[in-house]
Each structure stands twice: as C-alpha cells, then as structure tokens.
C-alpha cells in the first residue's frame, strides 16, 4: 500500500472520529468535477485498499450552459478511463434556480443510492463551504438549525431515517488545501465558470464579502465561523433532544393540538422548537419565525383567541387548555 500523506491522514482521522464511514461500505460519491469533489474522490480511492469500500460515482448535468454539458462529457470519459462505476444524469431544461436544482440532485442521489445499494452518499463540502453557508444563512435570517445546517452527516431524506447517510469527510479542510492537493496530484479539475458570476448572491459573498471581512476584520474568518457553527450545532441538538422528551406530554394528535400548561412551563427555546415541530406537521411547509411566534403568543392568551391565518387556510385557536389547529 502507498504511504498516506498528512492530508489523507487528517481525512481518515475525521472519518473515524465522526464515525462517517465503515469498512466494506458501498459509497456513492457526488462528483461535480470541481477541485473539492476531485480531491474527495482521489482520497477515497487512496484509502480504499485499507477500508475495502466499493466506490460508485454520480455526476449531475443541470444543462444550464453549454459548458456544463461539455463538462459532463469530459467527466464521463475520464471516469470510464479510470474504470470507476458511474452514472451521468442530465436534467430536463429547468430555470436557473438553486433550490430546484438542489432538489433535483438529491432525487438523483436517492435513486442511484438505491440502484447501487449504497448506504452512504459522500460529498466534498469543506470548512470553507461551511463558513460561507453560515454567513449566507445569517444574512438571510435563520435560526440555529440553519446556521449549523452543513454538518458532518445527516440522512439523505430527513423524513426517512432508513435513507442513506450524507457524509462530508472534507469538513476539516479548507478550499486552498483541496486546490493544493489537486495540483500536487495533477487531477483534471474542471473550472465552473458560473462560480464567477456576481449576479448570484452566493458568489458575491464568496468572492467579495468574505475577502473584505478577512482583510478588515478577521484574517481567520473561516475558522471563526466554523467554530460558531460547531457550537450552535451542539446547542441545537440539545434543544431538539429535550423537545423530543417534552413532545409526548404536550402533543394531542386527535385534535390536532398542543396542551398549553406543560408547554407554557417550558423554557422559551423548547416552546419554539415544539411549536416549530407541531406547525411543520400541520402546515404544508415549514413555518417561518413569525408563524412560530404567533403560536407562542397563544400559550398565554385567553380562551377563544386565535392566530392569523396560516398557509393553506389553517389557523390556531385556544380551546380550553389546548391550542388546536383548524383547517
């Protein structure tokens, strides 16, 4: 076996410490052809003899530009040359919408994870991505869940605990490190020209805002944001766990509603988490902060009080000791 570099050892250490992957697993690698995914794929291939993994690769072509289609053709040829089991999925023409594109990619990942019987979907997000995501979500307005959303692992489908695990072994590396690795190993990285388009807010944040903040406020900005995300993740997990313990005492599925007395006695952070979970069950979409707060206000309101209308014609109303959802 070839000797592992310090970078290989750091990733292998993260895999073990975070319990991301196990020997003999079938892995589906989400492969864009950029420097992070090339670095990820090469490290996994180098570690493969020690771990006994079976590696499969999926590339998704959104067809937003001729460059993307050319990239897909190039990567397919390279993957064939490398003898790697792979698939290239091509989207129907869709408008340039990041949320829609992400949903489509995850659908393809679910499909191919089932097809190849892969228990883990491996993604190349780095600490630089985590810092960028933290700041982006903070500027848009979000809670602890959004600020700590890019974690080491999660289920591919949040609603299905049997779905494959999404794992991110490179979260301990920064973007400059994956770039250096690709150069050292002469990997044929495909530059994504769309990443330079300042019409997209995320690109402007990465190319202009974060360098400005590094220069004028904190040269270690990415490390600072990663620390904040890590701390918030642990605190959010604690609140979610405590809310799960409180849930059977307050939730009345037959109504559907919540018992006000035990929920009113809980700390505000738990009230908000339980209210968020309840509204997520009864509304067509996850509730906003304002919608959660409207529900919280009713915990101390007089009988007969009701909330403003929620999406889908729902509202909450105080009925005795219960807060009931009507439709």
Curated annotation (Swiss-Prot):
This is tRNA(Ile)-lysidine synthase. The N-terminal region contains the highly conserved SGGXDS motif, predicted to be a P-loop motif involved in ATP binding. CDD domains: TilS_N. GO terms for molecular function: ATP binding; tRNA(Ile)-lysidine synthase activity. Ligates lysine onto the cytidine present at position 34 of the AUA codon-specific tRNA(Ile) that contains the anticodon CAU, in an ATP-dependent manner. Cytidine is converted to lysidine, thus changing the amino acid specificity of the tRNA from methionine to isoleucine. The gene is tilS. It comes from Synechococcus sp. (strain JA-2-3B'a(2-13)) (Cyanobacteria bacterium Yellowstone B-Prime). Its EC number is 6.3.4.19. InterPro entries: Rossmann-like_a/b/a_fold, TilS/TtcA_N, tRNA_Ile_lys_synt, tRNA_Ile_lys_synt_N. HAMAP family: tRNA_Ile_lys_synt. It holds the Pfam family ATP_bind_3. It is found in: Cytoplasm. It catalyses: cytidine(34) in tRNA(Ile2) + L-lysine + ATP = lysidine(34) in tRNA(Ile2) + AMP + diphosphate + H(+). GO terms for cellular component: cytoplasm. ATP binds at residues 32-37. GO terms for biological process: tRNA modification.
């Amino acid at each position: 076996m070839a000797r592992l570099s310090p970078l290989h050892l750091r990733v292998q250490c993260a895999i073990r410490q975070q319990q991301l992957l196990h020997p003999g697993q079938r892995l589906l690698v989400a492969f864009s052809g950029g420097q992070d995914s090339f670095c990820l794929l090469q490290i996994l291939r180098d570690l493969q003899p020690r771990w006994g993994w079976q590696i499969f690769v999926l590339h998704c072509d959104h067809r937003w530009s001729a460059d993307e289609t050319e990239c897909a053709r190039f990567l397919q040829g390279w993957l064939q040359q490398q003898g790697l089991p792979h698939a290239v999925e091509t989207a129907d023409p869709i408008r340039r919408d990041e949320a829609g594109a992400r949903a489509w990619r995850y659908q393809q990942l679910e499909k191919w994870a089932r097809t190849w019987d892969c228990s883990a979907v491996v993604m190349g997000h780095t600490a630089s991505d985590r810092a960028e995501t933290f700041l982006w979500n903070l500027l848009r307005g979000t809670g602890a869940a959004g600020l700590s959303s890019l974690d080491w692992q999660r289920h591919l489908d949040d609603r299905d605990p049997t779905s494959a695990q999404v794992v991110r072994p490179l979260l301990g590396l920064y973007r400059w490190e994956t770039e250096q690795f690709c150069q050292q190993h002469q990997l044929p990285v495909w530059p994504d020209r769309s990443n330079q388009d300042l019409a997209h807010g995320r690109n402007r944040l990465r190319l202009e805002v974060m360098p400005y903040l590094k220069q004028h406020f904190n040269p270690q900005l990415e490390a600072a944001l990663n620390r904040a995300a890590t701390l918030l993740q642990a605190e959010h997990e604690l609140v979610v766990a405590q809310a799960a313990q409180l849930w059977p005492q307050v939730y009345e599925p037959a109504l559907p509603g919540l018992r006000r007395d035990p929920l009113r006695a809980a700390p505000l952070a738990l009230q908000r988490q339980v209210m968020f979970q309840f509204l997520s069950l009864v509304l067509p979409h996850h509730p906003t902060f304002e919608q959660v707060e409207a529900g919280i206000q009713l915990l101390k309101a007089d009988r007969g009080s009701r909330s403003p209308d929620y999406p889908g014609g729902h509202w909450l109303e105080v009925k005795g000791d219960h807060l009931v959802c009507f439709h």
